[in-house]
A protein has these predicted regions:
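Short, surface-exposed "cap/lid" segments of acyl-processing enzymes
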Residues: 41-85
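Short beta-strand/loop motif that positions the catalytic acidic residue
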Residues: 164-172, 176
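Catalytic histidine neighborhood in serine/cysteine hydrolases
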Residues: 190-206
Length: 236
């Protein structure tokens, strides 16, 4: 699948679409603009990943370049993918809620995934603010693995949240100009079990000129965690 051309569908599909698709899901404060895509068959794994985008107040959407590359790396690894716009972003209803309402948005999307893919391993992934939302909800939502790109340590408090104990990858640019890299490294050092950390030298927050390196780093790191081969047909 290319992930580039999508077929528009009606609200709340009763099955996971059998081709790249766009559709609204019912969220807590209105519709949530959603995109899905399929891993290539054969080679698909029995897992679906929900991917969250950076801060909408600063222009973040599910079409962000880092989110797009993250989606591609996970799909090429065999996972079917779900992206959506948080409330108040793109065609999604509602307004920004500093991570609280966005957590409810994520829960609504995950509930749909659980309905249409009840036997799949659920993965979560996010970039920047999207990492914050997925980290704080991974345990509650039963994520089997988590991928966090440039988690915004120091910009949003993660103290008191139940940190994930599933396989967890963190990728951080060593020259991030938005999130303090050392704060992230220190935070990770205090987590048990410790996430797998990939430090990318000469790399800023948006991975300019390093997006293909990010893609490769994610694919390499998650390979041992991938679920078994998918036995059902696409869209099943």
């Amino acid at each position: 699948m290319t992930g580039m051309n999508t077929v528009p569908l009606s609200d709340n599909p009763a099955r996971f679409p059998g081709e790249a698709a766009s559709f609204p899901l019912t969220g807590p404060t209105g519709k949530l603009e959603t995109l899905t895509d399929l891993a290539d068959r054969p080679g698909a794994r029995a897992g679906t990943v929900v991917i969250c985008h950076p801060n909408p107040v600063q222009g973040g959407t599910m079409h962000n370049k880092v989110v797009t590359v993250l989606e591609r790396s996970l799909r090429e690894s065999g996972l079917d993918t779900v992206r959506f716009n948080f409330r108040g972003t793109g065609e999604s209803g509602g307004s920004y809620d500093d991570g609280r309402g966005e957590s409810d948005d994520l829960a609504a999307v995950v509930a749909w995934v659980r309905q249409v893919r009840p036997d799949d391993a659920l993965w979560l992934a996010g970039f920047s603010f999207g990492s914050y939302v997925t980290i704080r909800n991974a345990t509650k939502l039963g994520a089997r693995a988590l991928v966090s790109i440039a988690p915004p340590v120091g910009r949003w408090s993660m103290d008191g949240d139940t940190l994930p104990d599933c396989p967890w990858l963190v990728v951080m640019g060593e020259e991030d100009e938005v999130v303090d890299p050392q704060a992230v490294f220190d935070w990770i050092g205090g987590i048990r079990p410790r996430p797998e950390l990939v430090r990318m030298p000469e790399t800023g927050h948006f991975f300019h000129r390093r997006l293909m390196d990010l893609r490769g780093a994610v694919k390499h790191a998650i390979r041992p965690w991938l679920p078994p081969a998918r036995e059902t047909e696409a869209g099943g």
